């Protein structure tokens, strides 16, 4: 029984596959790749020939070859982030794999980078202009919850400096501060929350004075 064909690429999305066999091109515009190579498919508009990139080279690949002789990688950026594989992560981003894509748990690649303590991965993801800091997964956890729970104070600090929210509660009504497993993370989160609350109090006081002045 043959595998069902992969779903077509939506605009702005990239399909990623791992080659199970080497493909030898017959014409100059076809793409050569070897067993185990990662292929990024960017155009499936032609049903017979798909446009793909592998190791920085772009070319055409027979669609039936990809469907039958390659393994689909559903969340390559997440896999790279989980493993702390920086070169693969950069390659995914270079090939326009979406930085804010969600896996089955509703988590982003940033969440998994924070969960695994991969500071270098977090820093690279932060270079993406539209990276979403505060995405909550199906458990309601954000990247900040993950970093606090795992005790990675350096990553908590990075997230806070980038503007991650400390007031988001997960499905168990817990803030990132409630999940902090060491004093360093708790201290950073407390300080940030006190600063936020202080700024809010000051803002409210200014609004009150403005109202008094307008009377």
Swiss-Prot record:
Compartments reported by the entry: Cytoplasm
Entry keyword Translocase: no
GO cellular component, as recorded: cytoplasm
Span list, region Disordered: 192-215
Organism this protein belongs to: Mus musculus (Mouse)
Modified residues (Phosphoserine): 203, 214
Residues covered by the SH3 domain: 12-71
Modified residues (Phosphothreonine): 201
Entry keyword annotation includes Acetylation: yes
PROSITE patterns, A to Z: ANK_REP_REGION (PS50297), ANK_REPEAT (PS50088), SH3 (PS50002)
Subunit architecture: Interacts with C-SRC and SMN1. Interacts with FASLG.
Function: Induces bone resorption, acting probably through a signaling cascade which results in the secretion of factor(s) enhancing osteoclast formation and activity.
GO molecular-function terms, A-Z: SH3 domain binding
Chief location: cytoplasm
Entry domain remark: The SH3 domain mediates interaction with SMN1.
Name this polypeptide is given: Osteoclast-stimulating factor 1
Chain positions of ANK repeats: 72-101, 105-135, 139-168
Sites of N-acetylserine modification: 2
SMART domains (UniProt xref): ANK, SH3
């Amino acid at each position: 029984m043959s595998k069902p064909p992969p779903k077509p690429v939506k605009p702005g999305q990239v399909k990623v596959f791992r080659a199970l066999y080497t493909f030898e091109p017959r014409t100059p515009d076809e793409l050569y790749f070897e067993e185990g190579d990662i292929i990024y498919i960017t155009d499936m508009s032609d049903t017979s020939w798909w446009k793909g990139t592998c190791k920085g080279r772009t070319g055409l690949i027979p669609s039936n070859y990809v469907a039958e002789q390659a393994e689909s990688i559903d969340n390559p950026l997440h896999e790279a982030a989980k493993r702390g594989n920086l070169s693969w992560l950069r390659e995914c981003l270079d090939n326009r794999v979406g930085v804010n894509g969600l896996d089955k748990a509703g988590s982003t690649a940033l969440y998994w980078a924070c969960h695994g303590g991969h500071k270098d991965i977090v820093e690279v993801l932060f270079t993406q202009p539209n990276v979403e800091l505060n995405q909550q997964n199906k458990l309601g956890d954000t990247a900040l919850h993950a970093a606090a729970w795992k005790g990675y104070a350096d990553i908590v600090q990075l997230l806070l400096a980038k503007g991650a929210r400390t007031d988001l509660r997960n499905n168990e009504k817990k803030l990132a501060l409630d999940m902090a497993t060491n004093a360093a993370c708790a201290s950073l989160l407390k300080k940030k929350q006190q600063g936020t609350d202080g700024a809010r109090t000051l803002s409210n006081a200014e609004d009150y004075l403005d109202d008094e002045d307008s009377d």
